[in-house]
């Protein structure tokens, strides 16, 4: 689970493998203030930015780093892991005392835990003022007004489908990267997953709406967009009044033609719906980056069937082979669950073999966590915790070794970066990201921020690379 205190309104597109960025707030001392803490995935980060946009536009709230300064405190939650759920209630307890210091303080809980728990949150934490789901964040101003008018906690965890996108204000951009949500929900109903129950069924944004948003972002200087959805391959966007439906490959083709957009990323995808048209996109669309997050979850067909993933290991490998034939050098990240109910040592060995055969640059790997209301919750969780921990450590060690080998192979190569801002390691240096999602730190002047720059990789580290500028308008190599 990732978590971050959101301190900005514009979304910089962080990699799925990277921790969320922390950017200082710029609120004036006199402005009413908003504090948002975000748990979980990139969709939640996107939603948190939208919460900030909505409340800034309607109530003039500006973001703050400090919950003690806030007039509104929001927790945007994740229910994928059990500990993440409990973490929310722990953090709620830490801000409860602020109500005594500021009786007008509004405390809200949004996201997937809110969608799953609803009224139960208020029963467990009666000082919570508003509870809202991922599909109702645009109603936050009205929920807050109702709370202040009535004195009663407000709960809205409905699924109003496309209404959210129609109601959200235009994004305020800071930087050359941005998230664009193209759909919500998931209809796959994997046996372990709560997403269909917390975010609803798959609902796609209209095709033209997505293109207009991306074009507007490009006009504001955005060069890289990350298209977001729980399962972007399932995108089926209505094309105006034509009665036609655009699939995800079609959307990518049109986004690719928008002037000013130089890179396209997307997450998350489902192996079952990686169509040949999607594979062909990697051969035909050079702006589509050479990096793909493709969750496999396990390498045992028996476990995959129990998870209701809808594919076999051979089918997954076939998808990977076709992708790499279309785009040589494509790197992959993935998701893995160890200790799924009934997973044997043989099943786990098959997962390790899959990793060895395919090769991954990074992964989100977890010990299975029982989620109430899912089909897998009824299965017997019969793997001892120490065995789960050992398997997780083995799996992560193998993927770390593969990632290190990929990084080392990049030393001496020329890479094209989008420069995102100052380096976190050294504010006198810059940080950019390669096509395959590697963070690169290098000395260069600040005027390069937001630009595409060629560098030569000089060193590889566990979580980043180091480089020197190859050539920028006569800039001396390695010169800051």
UniProtKB/Swiss-Prot annotation:
Q: Which Pfam families match?
A: Radical_SAM (PF04055), TRAM (PF01938), UPF0004 (PF00919)
Q: Which cofactor does it need?
A: [4Fe-4S] cluster
Specify which residues bind [4Fe-4S] cluster 2 according to the UniProt entry for this protein.
186, 190, 193
Keywords noted in UniProt: 4Fe-4S, Cytoplasm, Iron, Iron-sulfur, Metal-binding, S-adenosyl-L-methionine, Transferase, tRNA processing
Annotated [4Fe-4S] cluster 1 binding sites:
41, 78, 112
Q: Where is the MTTase N-terminal domain?
A: 32-149
Known InterPro entries for this protein?
Answer: Elp3/MiaA/NifB-like_rSAM, Methylthiotransferase, Methylthiotransferase_CS, Methylthiotransferase_N, Methylthiotransferase_N_sf, MiaB_methiolase, rSAM, rSAM_horseshoe
The molecular function terms of the Gene Ontology recorded here are: 4 iron, 4 sulfur cluster binding; metal ion binding; N6-isopentenyladenosine methylthiotransferase activity
Q: Where in the cell is it found?
A: Cytoplasm
Q: What is its EC number?
A: 2.8.4.3
**A GO cellular component entry from the record:** cytosol
Gene3D superfamilies from the UniProt entry? Methylthiotransferase, N-terminal domain (3.40.50.12160), tm_1862 like domain (3.80.30.20)
Q: Which residues form the TRAM domain?
A: 408-471
HAMAP family, sorted: tRNA_metthiotr_MiaB
Listed under subunit, the entry gives: Monomer.
> Which PANTHER family would you find in this protein's record?
CDK5 REGULATORY SUBUNIT-ASSOCIATED PROTEIN 1, MITOCHONDRIAL TRNA METHYLTHIOTRANSFERASE CDK5RAP1
What family does the entry list? Belongs to the methylthiotransferase family. MiaB subfamily.
* Its biological purpose: Catalyzes the methylthiolation of N6-(dimethylallyl)adenosine (i(6)A), leading to the formation of 2-methylthio-N6-(dimethylallyl)adenosine (ms(2)i(6)A) at position 37 in tRNAs that read codons beginning with uridine.
Record-given protein name = tRNA-2-methylthio-N(6)-dimethylallyladenosine synthase
Source organism (scientific name): Bordetella petrii (strain ATCC BAA-461 / DSM 12804 / CCUG 43448)
């Amino acid at each position: 689970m990732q978590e971050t205190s959101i301190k900005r309104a514009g979304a910089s597109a962080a990699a799925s493998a990277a921790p969320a960025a922390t950017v200082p707030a710029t609120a004036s001392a006199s402005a009413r203030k908003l504090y948002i803490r975000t748990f979980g995935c990139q969709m939640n980060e996107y939603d948190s930015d939208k919460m900030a946009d909505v409340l800034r536009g309607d109530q003039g709230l500006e973001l703050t780093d400090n919950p003690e300064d806030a007039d509104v405190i929001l927790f945007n939650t994740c229910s994928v892991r059990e500990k993440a759920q409990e973490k929310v209630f722990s953090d709620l307890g830490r801000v409860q005392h602020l109500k005594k210091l500021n009786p007008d303080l509004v405390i809200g809980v949004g996201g997937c835990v809110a969608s799953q728990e609803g009224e139960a949150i208020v029963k467990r934490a009666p000082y919570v003022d508003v509870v809202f789901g991922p599909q109702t964040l645009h109603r936050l101003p009205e929920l807050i007004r109702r709370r202040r008018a009535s004195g009663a906690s407000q709960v809205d965890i409905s699924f109003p489908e496309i209404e959210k996108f129609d109601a959200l204000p235009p994004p305020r951009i800071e930087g050359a990267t941005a998230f664009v949500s193209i759909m919500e929900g998931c209809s796959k109903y994997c046996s372990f997953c709560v997403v269909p129950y917390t975010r609803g069924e798959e609902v796609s944004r209209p095709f033209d709406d997505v293109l207009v948003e991306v074009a507007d972002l490009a006009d504001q200087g955005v060069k890289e967009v990350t298209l977001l959805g729980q399962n972007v391959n399932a995108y089926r966007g209505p094309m105006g009044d034509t009665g036609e439906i655009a699939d995800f490959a079609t959307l990518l083709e049109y986004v690719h033609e928008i002037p000013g957009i130089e890179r396209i990323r997307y997450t998350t995808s489902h192996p079952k719906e990686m169509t040949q048209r999607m594979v062909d996109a990697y051969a035909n669309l050079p702006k589509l980056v050479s990096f793909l997050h493709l969750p496999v979850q396990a390498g045992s067909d028996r476990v995959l069937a129990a998870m209701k993933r809808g594919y076999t290991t051979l089918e997954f490998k076939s998808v990977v082979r076709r992708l790499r034939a279309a785009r040589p050098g494509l790197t992959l990240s993935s998701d893995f669950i160890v200790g799924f109910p009934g997973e044997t040592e043989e099943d786990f060995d098959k997962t390790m073999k899959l990793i060895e055969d395919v090769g991954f640059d990074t992964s989100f790997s977890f010990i299975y966590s029982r989620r109430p209301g899912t089909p897998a919750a009824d299965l017997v969780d019969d793997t001892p915790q120490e065995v789960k921990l050992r398997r997780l450590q083995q799996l992560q060690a193998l993927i770390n070794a593969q990632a290190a080998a990929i990084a080392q192979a990049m030393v001496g190569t020329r890479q094209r970066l989008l420069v995102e801002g100052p380096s976190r390691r050294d504010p006198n240096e810059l940080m950019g990201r390669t096509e395959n999602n590697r963070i690169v730190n290098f000395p260069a002047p600040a005027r390069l921020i937001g630009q595409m720059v060629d560098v030569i990789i000089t060193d590889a580290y566990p979580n980043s690379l180091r480089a020197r500028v190859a050539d920028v308008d006569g800039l001396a190599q390695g010169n800051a």
